[in-house]
Amino acid sequence: MNEPQLLIETWGQPGEIIDGVPMLESHDGKDLGLKPGLYIEGIFMQAEVVNRNKRLYPKRILEKAVKDYINEQVLTKQALGELNHPPRANVDPMQAAIIIEDMWWKGNDVYGRARVIEGDHGPGDKLAANIRAGWIPGVSSRGLGSLTDTNEGYRIVNEGFKLTVGVDAVWGPSAPDAWVTPKEITESQTAEADTSADDAYMALAEAMKKAL
């Protein structure tokens, strides 16, 4: 059996167009009642697909890893992520830029929502500024696991994989369809703001006017 190693996966390509349209997650009211703030939401991970790092996560293995991560980190409000993905297994809270609030499955895709951490002049403020300027971040996961080679040009993640960081916000992302939708929730809104960069900027401008 191979020794466990740090597996960093960059899931998706920011701004990727599939069949002529951006791969944006459709929102169905799940987000009603969110606290005011800036969020990123979309596909965090994918099972049963060869990603850009030439690795495949069997669904049964990723399901267990995600379930454990939700129970151990998301539900206990420990699920932090950073801006970019440093080469270590765990998050440095001093460098945290986001906190994951929810994760769920749709088919073979793991969706999630993370709140951008703002107000301390730290990495989250920089991430928020980039998003409000129109940047679309990608997402990257970190975990510990071993790999098995195949004869088809990719490697399979073995049983025992442990997800240690559900998502970091990164530039230039690895699952074919995984990138995220920024959205702004203001004091006067219970539904999400429009996900286009222009409309997100307008929502922010309106919120600033109301605060004056």
UniProtKB/Swiss-Prot annotation:
Keyword check for Lipid biosynthesis: no
Keywords: Autocatalytic cleavage, Hydrolase, Protease, Serine protease, Viral capsid assembly, Viral capsid maturation, Viral release from host cell
EC number: 3.4.21.-
Region of interest (Homomultimerization), ranges: 117-136
InterPro entries cross-referenced by the UniProt entry: Peptidase_U9_T4_prohead (IPR005082)
Keyword Hydrolase appears in the UniProt entry: yes
A matching Pfam family: Peptidase_S77
Propeptide: 207-212
Root EC class: hydrolase
Disulfide bonds, paired cysteine numbers: none
Site positions for Cleavage: 9-10, 206-207
pH dependence comment: Optimum pH is 8.5.
Name under which the protein is recorded: Prohead core protein protease
Source organism per UniProt: Enterobacteria phage T4 (Bacteriophage T4)
